[in-house]
Curated annotation (Swiss-Prot):
HAMAP family: Transcrip_reg_TACO1 (MF_00693). Belongs to the TACO1 family. GO terms for molecular function: DNA binding. It comes from Xanthomonas axonopodis pv. citri (strain 306). This is Probable transcriptional regulatory protein XAC3151. NCBIfam families: PRK00110.1, PRK12378.1, YebC/PmpR family DNA-binding transcriptional regulator.
Amino acid sequence: MGRGPSIEGRKNASDAKRGKMFTKIIREISVAARAGGGDPSNNPRLRTAMDKGLSSNMSKDVMERAIKKSTGELEGVEYEEVRYEGYAPGGVAVIVDCLTDNRVRTVADVRHAFSKCGGNMGTEGSVAFMFKRLGVLSFAAGIDEDTLTDAAIDAGADDVVVYPEDGAIDVLTAPDAFAQVRDALVATGLEPAHAEITFRADNDIAVDGDTAVQVRKLLDMLEDLDDVQDVYSNVDQAALGA
């Protein structure tokens, strides 16, 4: 009779996932600090990365060390930002954002993933026009819709989207207004459950059958690469069982 994964096996998998998430956050903190300085009060990108670290139970000491390495107070690795674009099976557009200390390694890994899963890499700008860059502040069900909407508009948000299926609400902003809107909402006691600057597709593409399997395989493979920070696509997530 077969047995499921052991408790130790599940714990090891959970620890590995947590370690990968921490690595991504540390890299983002490092790049943000190098680009905009080590003071999160004057560096919205750094503050966003640190907020993500705190919500993931990362210690402040770990984050401070990452900042000091980036600002030259401690010796550390320098990472650069690179973005790759391409197509998954079914014409699904994919954007892959990376932070790397070895561009040659990273592009080889990303290209291998596309090739292995039946996709192909494109040139810069080949799919980015299908997406919008925007800030998203997500609020769980239970928050007063009118109060949040009024506060968001006053703070400079572009739109407020309510999801009737679960009552969740997203506040959408221009990227350069993200920090301003977030700070204004938090100051009034409206703390988002999640906040980030991201890409959203203008239109989703539905896939099914073997194509859906291959698209999911590619997205998962890209997400698992050490140098990959974020993966965006215009696939209809419902088609992937998400």
